[in-house]
Amino acid sequence: MRRALMIFTVIVSSGLLAAPAVMQDMPVGVSPYDVVDGWLKPFASSGHSFGGTSAVFAESPDRIFIAQRGEHRLPDPVPPGFQGFLGSIGVRANTAFESRVWQNVIFVVDGDGNMIEAWTQWDDMFQSDAEEGPSGIHKIKINPFDSDRKLWVADTTNHQVHAFSNDGEELVMSLGAGGAGDDNDHFDTPWDMAFLADGSIFVSDRGNSRIMKFDAEGNFVTTWGVNGSGRGEFDRPHAVATDSIGRIYVGDMGNNRVQVFNETTRSVWYHPNISPIATWPGFERPTDIYATGYDVWISDNSADTAEAAAGDATRPARMVKLDWNGNPQFSWEIAGLGTGAGEMAVLHQFSVDVEKNFYAADPMHGRVQKFIQKEGASFMETFGAPDPPLQ
């Protein structure tokens, strides 16, 4: 064990991680999870359904935040086979703009999927008449180092990132001046957020192909990245995450890869304080990243949401486990692309609770599903508990 630790230290301190194995060579195993069929209970008013459920975050096994891009009016009469979500009647929730109603955008459910809070006071904030391009909430997270457990929201309608009090009563902070832009005061379609122990916030700024950093008070600190496919360049950075030693992982979706960075005072790259230390190629559409103290999990789709809406997905989403050097450890696929239990068109965001249940948001079919470990599942094939745990 001591010898392995010494080798790892040398690799990291040299500024580059070991080259990962080819992702396509990774064996695809059987999912170690069972779906909880019908977990998320409908609560919309009569004639309405869940909309594009783009985001999920489990604060605890009994308190799970969900965000959707508005609800949808159901056809009248409702087609046979409706199971409480639009995908069950062949409607793509993320593109059915004509039936969208901006209500119940953020809500909270318990461990059995029952709605316990609806933050309707903020619905108007995210309203959009756009029928093309992004709108509404893209992802939600809680900073694990924040004892107040504020809910952070990537708002693509207003091109801002917001922090709400945990009970939803107060808007605590907003990053970005509002409206799309490319200077240090603006985002162009923020997609994700990640955090450091000192309260720093990283934001993936999709339209500007960059990562922006802010301090705990929301002041701009720095930025890096331009559109491209070179080292430290991005094409639609969809996910950003940090691990327990402060490394920064970026799901570079348009370039089909994950890039890894660290903060340093000895960077020889063009940025004086940020250094690219690894590129992990071989993905198709890395949409979300979950880093623990031991490994990194990545959700990899065969299509993004627009392509999935056009029926261009060629395989179900895949969960990929890598070690800290980017070496593939294990992977398994979601049950299918359909609307059956455990299936989904797109795995957009996922979250893991302290009991190692995981939750997956599918904005195309318009539902969030809960999965629990199969009896006897190996810890090598399942998610570790959040590390660091929420304060």
Regions found by a protein language model. Name each.
Residues 22-391:
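Eukaryotic scaffold repeat domains enriched in small/polar residues
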Residues 6-16:
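Bacterial N-terminal signal peptides
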Residues 1-4:
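Positively charged n-region of N-terminal signal peptides that target proteins for export
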